[in-house]
A protein has these predicted regions:
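Hydrophobic core segments of alpha-helical transmembrane domains in multi-pass membrane transport
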Residues: 29-41, 70, 141, 145, ...
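Cytosolic-side transmembrane-helix boundaries in multi-pass membrane proteins
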Residues: 1-34, 38, 215-222, 294-333
Length: 333
């Protein structure tokens, strides 16, 4: 008589991912997004209009594009506070070019090159000179925007070609804007880069312990330089979009964008201390920020109230993980 073997219970690898997915930060963000969407739909009769929802996407995509690259930079343990100033400088250079008769391809190229150049400048100061990124980018924030103010003064550049307007005002299909399409494509690219490549694994390793990563053969300085370049490039892309959408260039353009970008990143679950985060969370946080600010706009809430909200939200999302870790340590002690 043979013994019947007891059935094996092997759902650990299946159950844990399901459980962690249900109780993950991203799942909480989905619930918050749905709740805000519902509140907005009840608060304003215009919110659920298809074209109104399309306008919503213009409210956050330019900042969200920068947030994708900023997420990788913060995960690596660095930060860039100059992104809004990069937009201003790139937009100013495009304005000068259009006054000289440049066409649409040249304008796009100038925006991207200026953004990439500014990001590379930040990266060199941080990686080659060993300066703290927060200090460097506070300095370049003033530098880049100051140059824009010197060039423009109180005037504004206008007269952009009609073909240039597509990037910030055009639609790919029905109410689906070009800006939203570009953001979704970029989100997929950055998700793959961070979560499915060796480059992404190195970014996490650097954020967790840069010294250990260096000893294990990771070229820390090179990767951080690339991340600063990517952040500058995304700011350059955002400058093309916002300049195209507004149809003009002013030195005050995109003022305050850097705080909204960082809020999106941290709200998305990226640790401000580095070493943890996900692109999915950043995408969800971008939609939440867009829903909140657009909903407040429909209710004619003053802009200063939106600024107060963003400031409070940034403090809360930075403080919560730190307080939570402190509580856990006290419980384990």
């Amino acid at each position: 008589m043979t013994d019947t073997p007891a059935p094996r219970h092997i759902p650990d690898r299946l159950d844990k991912p399901l459980t962690s997915a249900i109780f993950s930060w991203e799942a909480l963000l989905v619930v918050v997004a749905v709740a805000i969407f519902a509140v907005n739909s009840f608060a304003s009769p215009y919110f659920l209009d298809a074209w109104s929802l399309s306008d919503l996407t213009f409210n956050f995509t330019e900042k969200a594009l920068i947030a994708l690259a900023m997420a990788l930079l913060i995960i690596s343990g660095e930060i860039d506070l100059s992104v809004a100033a990069i937009i201003a400088l790139a937009s100013t250079m495009m304005g000068m070019a259009v006054q000289a008769g440049a066409g649409m391809p040249e304008l796009v190229a100038i925006g991207l090159v200026v953004g990439l150049g500014c990001g590379a400048f930040n990266g060199l100061l941080v990686t080659r000179l060993g300066l703290p990124s927060i200090v460097v980018t506070i300095g370049t924030m003033s530098l880049f925007r100051g140059i824009a103010f010197i060039i423009l003064g109180d005037q504004a550049y206008k007269g952009y070609p009609a073909s240039f307007a597509f990037f910030g005002q055009g639609y790919v299909w029905w109410v689906v804007s070009f800006e939203l399409t570009l953001f979704l494509v970029a989100a997929v690219v950055y998700w793959f880069l961070l979560h499915r490549t060796s480059f992404g694994r190195r970014v996490f390793a650097i954020g967790n312990n840069p010294v250990a990563a260096q000893f294990s053969g990771v070229r820390v300085g090179r990767i951080k330089f690339i991340l600063f370049c990517l952040t500058g490039l995304m700011a350059g892309i955002a400058s093309v979009l916002i300049t195209s959408r507004l149809g003009s260039t002013r030195p005050s353009i995109a003022q305050g964008y850097e705080l909204e970008v960082i809020t999106m990143v941290v709200l998305g679950g990226v640790s401000i201390l580095g070493g943890a985060g996900s692109i999915v969370g950043v995408v969800l946080a971008a939609f939440i920020m867009g829903l909140v600010t657009f909903g407040l706009g429909l209710l004619n809430v003053p802009g200063i109230v939106m600024s107060i909200f963003i400031g409070l939200l940034l403090i809360i999302v930075i403080a919560l993980p730190i307080l939570w870790r402190r509580v856990r340590r006290e419980r384990l002690a």
